[in-house]
Amino acid sequence: AVNEKGYVESVWELLKKHDLGCWAISSHLVGQATCDNIDERHQCILPAHVWGDGNPEGVRQRACAEMALTAQAARKFFDAGKAYMADKPKGSGKTVVNGFTGSSIWHSIYAFPPTSQAYWDAGFADFARRFGPILEAFDKSNVNFALEVHPTEIAFDLASAQRAIEAVKGHKRFGFNYDPSHLGYQGVDYVKFIRAF
């Protein structure tokens, strides 16, 4: 979308044809690969240019670069649709990309074999190291990233959501996409989540 001439305009034309609007875009699948422990399962959810040769660290680095480009694509897309969206409900008034982050520590959630606090700290530090530059790219494009709190992500409940915020030092471009179904399935109080965040 960033470099393809006419692409975003064609999407807006399709939306207009069906009298639809758009208030956020999604980058869940590429986002999943930014912090995940990459294995062969990721190949089927990633574009070929992000998967590359499948080397796990290379996949993560390409996913991070693609997420930074996503901010530019979102800016271009929503700027192209301003006139059309003028008569639609306003929503938040912000440009938002919803998505996933993956997690280098999710697989250890059950804590057996025993998981030390240092292990958890390293996982949140990995998230901050990888996602910090992505959030800076989002800031440069005046776009917000909304993590869908979900199993397999760095934030999957109230405590991990708070730690994710702390890991990125409360970055103004980082927030949450609220989907109570995933919280409910885990027995997390989804009303408390809204009040907390």
Give the positions of each predicted feature.
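Short hydrophobic interaction/assembly module
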Residues: V8-N37
